[in-house]
């Protein structure tokens, strides 16, 4: 994206939010598309790579949802203490192998 595109986006659009990759999302103030919806765009942090958009922001960009996504903090990893030490028996004692 050229610097002039970034200038016009920041001038004519309102900033809606940022994701964890520091991409900035904008929505137009008064420019609407042919379906009557406001235009939405993204300014990428580093290179213009569409795979760097999280699924929640992707659905917002393509008008699948109208709610602005929130950054959800994930919990840190914890060890599962509910795992039993003794494994259940897998052999069935009632089973007799067939012998011809």
UniProtKB/Swiss-Prot annotation:
Mind naming one GO cellular-component term on file for this protein? Answer: respiratory chain complex I
A Pfam match? NDUFA12
Q: Which GO terms describe its biological process?
A: response to oxidative stress
Signal peptide limits: none
**Top-level taxonomic group:** Bacteria
What InterPro entries does the annotation carry? NDUFA12
User: What residue intervals traverse the membrane?
Assistant: none
Q: Which NCBIfam families match?
A: PRK06630.1
| The protein, known as | Uncharacterized protein RP725
């Amino acid at each position: 994206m050229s610097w002039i595109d970034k200038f016009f986006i920041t001038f004519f659009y309102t900033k809606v939010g940022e994701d964890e990759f520091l991409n900035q999302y904008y929505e137009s103030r008064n420019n609407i598309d042919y379906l009557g919806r406001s235009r939405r765009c993204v300014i990428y942090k580093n290179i213009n790579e569409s795979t760097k958009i999280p699924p929640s922001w992707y659905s917002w960009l393509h008008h699948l949802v109208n709610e602005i996504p929130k950054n959800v903090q994930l919990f840190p990893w914890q060890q599962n203490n509910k795992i039993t030490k003794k494994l259940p028996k897998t052999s069935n004692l009632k089973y007799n192998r067939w012998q011809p």
